[in-house]
Design a protein with these regions (language model features):
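GST-like domain detector, emphasizing the conserved glutathione-binding G-site
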Residues: 2-136, 140, 155
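GST superfamily/GST-like fold recognition
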Residues: 116, 160-172
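Alpha-helical packing segments of well-folded alpha/beta enzyme cores
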Residues: 141-145
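Hydrophobic alpha-helical bundle segments that form small-molecule/ligand-binding pockets
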Residues: 146-162
Length: 172
């Protein structure tokens, strides 16, 4: 896999249907960070190739090469971007508002998104012995998480930080 040299143009390793990659693309655009994108086709198992595993041993997208570093996990990438390129900000101004956005992120990252991951759903189906089990299993947790998310986001409103096209969309 092609990569950026230290100090060169950042390279985002991404899959077009990955919401994790999507949130990093949104953040890079919001912050005006020019970068190259390298497609990693998950359906063709390119994320399992030795070249990609050298970038991210978990074999997950996204991965970002930037400032001489290779970063993985979307929220860690967002935190790095926020700390190294603070303007324009991804997070709102007050500690309470930032905590709210982080809560929303964790609701998606930890409680909702993992169960919609194709590899997790396939594993659930194999355990249950029937294909329909994966959708039932995932739907249960996704509904629960999104319901909590909707309650949390309702307390914001109006600003880019949490409603409409929201920062929590970037951070989840």
């Amino acid at each position: 896999m092609a990569s950026a040299a230290a100090g060169g143009l950042p390279v985002l390793f991404s899959y077009f249907r990955s919401s994790c990659s999507y949130r990093v693309r949104i953040a890079l655009a919001h912050k005006g960070v020019e970068h190259a994108t390298r497609a990693v086709n998950l359906l063709k198992s390119e994320h399992k190739a030795p070249e990609f595993l050298a970038l991210n041993p978990l074999g997950l997208v996204p991965a970002l090469q930037i400032d001489g570093h290779t970063l993985a996990q979307s929220v860690a990438i967002l935190e790095y971007l926020e700390e190294t390129r603070p303007s324009p900000a991804l997070l709102p101004g007050t500690p309470a508002e930032r905590a709210q956005v982080r809560w929303l992120c964790q609701t998606i990252c930890a409680d909702t998104q993992p169960v919609q991951n194709l590899s997790v759903m396939n594993h659930a189906a194999s355990l249950a012995g029937r294909e329909s089990a994966k959708k039932e299993w995932a739907s249960h947790y996704i509904r629960r998480g999104l319901s909590a998310f909707e309650s949390g986001v309702a307390s914001f409103g109006g600003e880019f930080c949490a409603a409409g096209v929201q920062r929590d969309e970037v951070w989840h």
